[in-house]
Swiss-Prot record:
Keyword set, alphabetical order: Cytoplasm, Elongation factor, Hydroxylation, Protein biosynthesis
Post-translational modification comment from the UniProt entry: May be beta-lysylated on the epsilon-amino group of Lys-34 by the combined action of EpmA and EpmB, and then hydroxylated on the C5 position of the same residue by EpmC (if this protein is present). Lysylation is critical for the stimulatory effect of EF-P on peptide-bond formation. The lysylation moiety may extend toward the peptidyltransferase center and stabilize the terminal 3-CCA end of the tRNA. Hydroxylation of the C5 position on Lys-34 may allow additional potential stabilizing hydrogen-bond interactions with the P-tRNA.
Family annotation (SMART domains): EFP (SM01185), Elong-fact-P_C (SM00841)
Family, similarity comment: Belongs to the elongation factor P family.
Protein name: Elongation factor P
Pathway: Protein biosynthesis; polypeptide chain elongation
Chain positions found as N6-(3,6-diaminohexanoyl)-5-hydroxylysine: K34
Localization per Swiss-Prot or TrEMBL: Cytoplasm
PANTHER family hit by this protein: ELONGATION FACTOR P, ELONGATION FACTOR P (EF-P) FAMILY PROTEIN
Function: Involved in peptide bond synthesis. Alleviates ribosome stalling that occurs when 3 or more consecutive Pro residues or the sequence PPG is present in a protein, possibly by augmenting the peptidyl transferase activity of the ribosome. Modification of Lys-34 is required for alleviation.
Length: 188
């Protein structure tokens, strides 16, 4: 297995920490006035999302993780698994609830996603940045409601709940930012 020296470590690299894949989020090289230089490495565990920090000597190494980000198309969910297909090879993989990481609330079918595979198994799914979903349930809009007057909760066709402006009604299609879970606009 490949390994990285402390001089080669950069943000975004995938490493193994205690046999679990992680992404480096921040590195800081520290050269104190007295003593040996060291590197502070901050990383996020891909499966759990926890952020941790470790201090390493300049002679230490980090093991590279066999983690691949692949563009795939979301096909369907059978209740227990979410199925994805690679467009070029038509190879299919299935992700469980842990592998989805909360992305399932933004997917209705045929969206292009980035699936993170570790040893061929999905451990993370990143949905498109923006999705268009239909509102299935919300309070009715009243006369005089404007965009500046707060908001109301709306349930989308996938089961996700987002805050929308008061003028948005049931059965309308809205655009949602999946990174923040916020309403962006109505779709005409």
């Amino acid at each position: 297995m490949a390994s990285y020296g402390m001089n080669d470590v950069k943000n975004g690299m995938k490493i193994l920490v205690n046999a679990e894949p992680a992404v480096i989020t921040d590195t800081e090289y520290v050269k104190p006035g007295k003593g040996q230089a060291f590197t502070r490495v901050k990383y996020r565990l891909i499966k759990s999302g926890r952020v941790q920090e470790v201090t390493m000597k300049s002679t230490d190494t980090l093991e590279a993780a066999d983690v691949v980000d692949t563009d795939m198309q979301y096909l369907y969910s059978d209740g227990e698994y979410w199925h994805f297909m690679q467009q070029e090879t038509f190879e299919q993989v299935q992700a469980d609830k842990n592998g989805m990481g909360g992305a399932e609330k933004w997917l209705k079918g045929e969206e292009q996603c980035v699936v993170t595979l570790w040893n061929g198994v999905p451990i993370g799914v990143q949905p498109p940045n923006f999705v268009e979903l239909k509102i299935t349930e919300t309070d009715p809009g009243l006369r005089g409601d404007t965009s500046g007057g707060g908001g109301k909760p709306a349930t989308l066709e996938t089961g996700a709940v987002v805050r929308v402006p008061l003028f948005v009604n049931q059965d309308e299609v809205i655009k949602v930012d999946t990174r923040s879970g916020e309403y962006v606009s109505r779709v005409k």
